[in-house]
Regions:
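Inter-helical turn/loop segments and adjacent helix faces that build the functional surface
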Residues: 8-24
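Short beta-strand-alpha-helix junction that forms the catalytic/metal-binding core
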Residues: 122, 134-162
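C-terminal, well-folded lobe of enzymatic/effector domains
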Residues: 182-249
Length: 249
């Protein structure tokens, strides 16, 4: 990133004279560096390759190239598909850098200035609560579900989150009376009551696990589509559909 900035700032090799085009390029470079910071975390770009990858990125001037909407979609869908392979029951993975960077980008656009200046703390909340999901899986002897998937996560003010304990937003009538539910839906969870109705069903037989899995997968897929659109809007990326031949850079 530093190499790209210097190459564009001093394009003639004279480090005493700033390139005449720098004023036109610096805004683009600043935006690209932020985009690649997010993109490289989601794709785990620097997880392998070492020094050779550093030289390759610098030589190709990688960070001066705009990431297309299609490349973003492929990267996000690949990350989502990998996370949906998890089979969690008792042990649920904690959020990692990929989940945090996606959530942070999304909530840039939904948190107000007052939210950001507030001393209130925020939790990463499982929309389908961990303990409740564990019980549903155990009741029908299931092999596990991706409870920690990004599509099941949101930020929630600490006080609001902990008051509902192991229930979802819609199950505790007392909890609903003490919060602004529409505010939670529009600002934090991006859900509607219909999205979580399947959690109120009984799953008691072994064959019920496939029904539970289907409902949960449908919920995650639907909500992840919402998250992608929110992230694109927040970062100013044009949403583009992709086909199977699209590759991640």
């Amino acid at each position: 990133m530093i190499s790209t900035t210097f190459k564009e700032m001093y394009s003639n090799g004279d480090y005493n004279t700033v390139s005449p085009q720098w004023n036109d390029k610096k805004e683009m470079i600043a935006k690209n560096l932020m985009m690649y910071y997010v993109y490289d975390i989601i794709t785990n770009y620097w997880s392998e390759g070492g020094t050779n990858k550093i030289h390759s990125a610098a030589k190709l001037n990688r960070y001066a190239t705009l990431i297309s909407g299609r490349e973003w979609i492929v990267a996000l869908d690949s990350f989502f598909e990998r996370s949906m392979l998890r089979a969690e029951t008792k042990k649920v993975a904690s959020p990692k850098s990929e989940e945090y960077v996606i959530l942070n980008c999304i909530y840039l656009n939904t948190f107000t200035a007052m939210d950001q200046l507030s001393i209130e703390r925020f939790d990463v909340e499982h929309i389908e609560p961990k303990e409740q999901m564990r019980k549903l899986i155990e009741n029908c002897s299931g092999e596990g579900l991706p409870i920690s998937c990004i599509a099941n996560l949101c930020y929630l003010p600490e006080g609001i989150n902990r008051s509902k304990q192991d229930r979802n937003f819609y199950q505790d009538k007392k909890y609903i009376k003490n919060i602004d539910l529409s505010d939670v839906e529009n600002k934090y969870s991006f859900t509607e009551v219909e999205d979580l109705e399947w959690m109120d069903m009984l799953y008691e037989k072994k064959e019920d696990f496939e029904v539970l899995k289907e409902y949960y997968t449908e919920f995650c897929t639907k909500r992840f589509t919402k998250l992608k659109h929110l992230l694109f809007n927040s970062l100013g990326i044009k949403y583009e559909e992709v086909d199977d031949s699209q590759e991640v850079i």
